[in-house]
Amino acid sequence: MKTPTGPGTAAPRRGSRRIVDVAILTGALLALVAATLAARWAWTPAPGPEEQVSCAPYGLEDVSTAPRGGARPLSTGPVLSGGLRWAEGTSDRLDVTFEHDGTTSSYHVFADGIDWSEPVGVVFRLHGDGAYEYEHPEHKVSCLAEVARSHNAVLVAPRTPDRQGEPTWWEDLDGNAEWFLALAEQRIFAEYDLDRSRTWLHGYSGGAEFISYELLADRADFLQGGGAVLSGGGGAPSTGTSQPTDEQLEQLVLHWDVGLEDDGTDPYAPFDALSAAAAGHAWYEDAGWARTSVRYREGVDHFELPEARVLDAAMTAGESPGERSAELSPAASTEPPRGAAADGRD
C-alpha cells in the first residue's frame, strides 16, 4: 500500500496531535470553499412547486425533475419489512431528527416514486463543508434523488452532527462515523425494507474525504454491496483497519471523479481535490480493490462536476459487473496529474 508523504495527506485521527495541525491548515481553506459554494448558489431562487429543476448542471442534459424538499413536508411513514407503517405508499421525509449517544443531527429521506414490490437500494449522500446542499435540496439533491429513483433506490441525505464552526464530516471522523452508522442501522435499515447489497455512499468534497478516510478505511463492513462515488476529493488514509472480504474487494465499485482544474490554485476553491483524488484512488487500488476507477475531467473545477451523471453510471456499473463504463473510465486525452498520488491533503 502507498502511504502519501505530502503535507496533510494522512487522515486526522481523534486523539491525535495531528488534528490540531490539520484543523489549522485546512479549516480555513475548506471554509472558504463552503462560503464560495453558498455565494455561488445563493442567488438561485428556489423553484416553485409547479416548476421543474433542470439536471443539466449536474451532467444530465435532458433530465428535469420536480424540486424536492422546498416545503419541508414529512411523509406518512417509512416502509417496514412486511408492510407499511401508516399509509399506502411513502413520500419524502425531511429534517428528521436522530440522536445517538448524546449526539443529535437530522436527515432527509427521498422516497417518492419507489416501487416497494421490487428490491430497493439506498444511496447515502454526504454533503461538502458548510452543508449548503442539505439546507437547499431543491437543486442538486433533487437530481441525485431522481437518479437514485431511476435505480429504485431511496436517497438519504444526512447533515453532519458537527456544530463547531463550519459543519464538516472530516474534522471528527470517529465521532461523526459513529453517529452516521447508528443512523443507518437504527433508522434507515431498521425502518425501510432495503436490499443491503445495493448500498451506495456518495460524497462531495469534505463528504468524499469522510468516505475515503473513515468509512472505507475503517468501516468497510458497512458496505455489503454497491460501492462508493467520491466527487471532488477522497484522499488517501494513513492507515486502514478494515478487513474487506474477497467478495467486497472484487465486487464493490469505488470511483473517484475530479476536475483537472480542481488543484487548489483557484482562490475560491483552495482545497487541492485533484491531488486528494489521485492519492485516494492509488491507495485503494494498491490495497487490492479490483473495481476502482478515477476520471480526471478537462476544463472542470470544484463546482462543475457532473455528479448526477456519474452516480447514474456507477450504479449502472454495480448492476452490470461485466460491463465497463465509459463514463467512469479516464478520458483518452487525460492522464493522472504528475506526482499527485503523493501530494494529496486532508
Annotated model-derived regions:
Residues 2, 21-24, 31, 35-121, ...:
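A domain-start/cap signature at the N-terminus of enzymes
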Residues 114-167:
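Short substrate-entry loop that stabilizes the transition state in hydrolases
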